[in-house]
């Protein structure tokens, strides 16, 4: 009889990728995934530490799991093994056992390949096991081959960690220094994904355009080199990459957006602020003019490219003028979609110890104003697509029985009616008939 594995994933697409790899890792040991936490023999929370709210969600969920464990005991059932993985595990370590002593395993994002051994120790009645080692090479060398097909769109991790040390960010402390997988590893995993019917590959990294992996004859490949290599894979239709840092947008990568048709005309390029003063305080290593120059060059290379970004409001010391500078940047760039957040002090980061923290009510007010402007731009872009024909990759079911959902080249969700689901996994021409803030509606030509 198979054992059941339940994984709840928080945060970024890298965590989504890691969760898939954990499934692949534990499958040979008899664990099959379930979406029902009540039947799980192992419960894994793959956590995010980028903001305080995200971290506290972990502890709230652990509280609910404790109640589930108590119910099991009352019914005479064995309790599940509880694992806290990911960036909260890396950042808080032993503190997790102090706050939630019923947790069995704490494992960092570079160490989860040791989960089979850690789980076997818990089965042998060892408790409160922790593994937070930072050996990036070991993680990638021990990743299993893809067992669970990800569908029409497949995420592949090519780079982890960050050397930029932005003063608001915990990534260098939870994911470590920048490390890139070899070209051979990435190419082999990409071939496997395409053999499992993936039409699109999305390359992942905390700072993906800093990729510098070893290729044939020990040549160092840039991200542009890697993309050119992957573009040669037969039956692969689309390539994307995320998340990028403006300082690593090299000439060859910018030019590739104009020459490689498989590279989609959509780029997530976080700027965080439009104020030079705040950019310097954040240690972003560039100013607003540098960012504008990158945007202009991308649009010169490919005129139909659409941009996305991240913004943080209320960073310590942010004045009304600094915030106005951010709004000005948004107005000038004109984004297709964006993500925006209030600054959240993270323990251990330089921003957290600054004495000029912004009051919450001011942060909330600024976030509302910014999000209204970003929503206006996103809706305008979506509405501009009505009446046009777009190539859509259908990759998942909709809420309704005869509905499926796909993605345009610009990462917009498109809903259509397809009663027999025959278009799942295919790229087809769709005429856009309706636009909303977060989605499009279309019809097959």
Swiss-Prot record:
The keyword Cytoplasm applies. Residues 3-124 form the MTTase N-terminal domain. Its EC number is 2.8.4.3. [4Fe-4S] cluster 1 binds at residues 12, 48, 87. One of its GO terms (cellular component) is cytosol. Transmembrane segments: none annotated. PROSITE patterns: MTTASE_N, MTTASE_RADICAL, RADICAL_SAM, TRAM. Its cofactor is [4Fe-4S] cluster. InterPro entries: Elp3/MiaA/NifB-like_rSAM (IPR006638), Methylthiotransferase (IPR005839), Methylthiotransferase_CS (IPR020612), Methylthiotransferase_N (IPR013848), Methylthiotransferase_N_sf (IPR038135), MiaB_methiolase (IPR006463), rSAM (IPR007197), rSAM_horseshoe (IPR023404). [4Fe-4S] cluster 2 binds at residues 162, 166, 169. It comes from the Bacteria. Keywords: 4Fe-4S, Cytoplasm, Iron, Iron-sulfur, Metal-binding, S-adenosyl-L-methionine, Transferase, tRNA processing. Residues 148-380 form the Radical SAM core domain. Binds 2 [4Fe-4S] clusters. One cluster is coordinated with 3 cysteines and an exchangeable S-adenosyl-L-methionine. Catalyzes the methylthiolation of N6-(dimethylallyl)adenosine (i(6)A), leading to the formation of 2-methylthio-N6-(dimethylallyl)adenosine (ms(2)i(6)A) at position 37 in tRNAs that read codons beginning with uridine. Belongs to the methylthiotransferase family. MiaB subfamily. This is tRNA-2-methylthio-N(6)-dimethylallyladenosine synthase. It comes from Rickettsia prowazekii (strain Madrid E).
